[in-house]
């Protein structure tokens, strides 16, 4: 439900603009020290009109993962890999548990900064979107 709620909110927000959101069927191509790999984030947003591939994205500006609290390996591994994407401005991790709501935003500003929201509003600066934690779990 969390993924669907956020995906619908982002699609509505981005409609008619230069950015486009994709759900988990679109993979992201990541090159780490010459080693190419692919990941399937839950939601990915690109603003690059020159994306030339139908099945994967090379220039994401926002990546969202919906994770269980037990998915520490995913959190660490994916964040370490995603940091190598030069166009990535924000990496967002959202807890799937309604009893433990949490939105963690890793934002690149010269270096990566982290902020965590368990209630109230959160902003995805890369796409100018503001939402509430409660709406994700509604």
Predicted features along the sequence, with ranges:
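Gly/Pro/Ser/Thr-rich low-complexity, intrinsically disordered segments predominantly at protein N-termini
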Residues: 1-138
């Amino acid at each position: 439900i969390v993924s669907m709620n956020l995906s619908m909110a982002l699609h509505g927000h981005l409609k008619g603009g230069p950015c486009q959101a994709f759900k988990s069927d679109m993979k992201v191509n990541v090159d780490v020290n010459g080693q190419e790999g692919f990941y399937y984030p839950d939601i990915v947003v690109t603003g690059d009109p020159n994306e030339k591939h139908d099945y994967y994205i090379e220039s994401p500006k926002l990546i969202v993962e919906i994770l269980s609290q037990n998915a520490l390996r995913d959190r660490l591994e994916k964040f370490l890999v995603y940091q190598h994407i030069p166009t990535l401005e924000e990496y967002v991790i959202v807890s799937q548990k309604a009893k433990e709501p949490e939105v963690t935003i890793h934002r690149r500003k010269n270096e990566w900064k982290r902020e965590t929201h368990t209630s109230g509003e959160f902003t995805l600066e890369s796409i100018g979107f503001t939402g509430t934690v409660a709406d994700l779990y509604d």
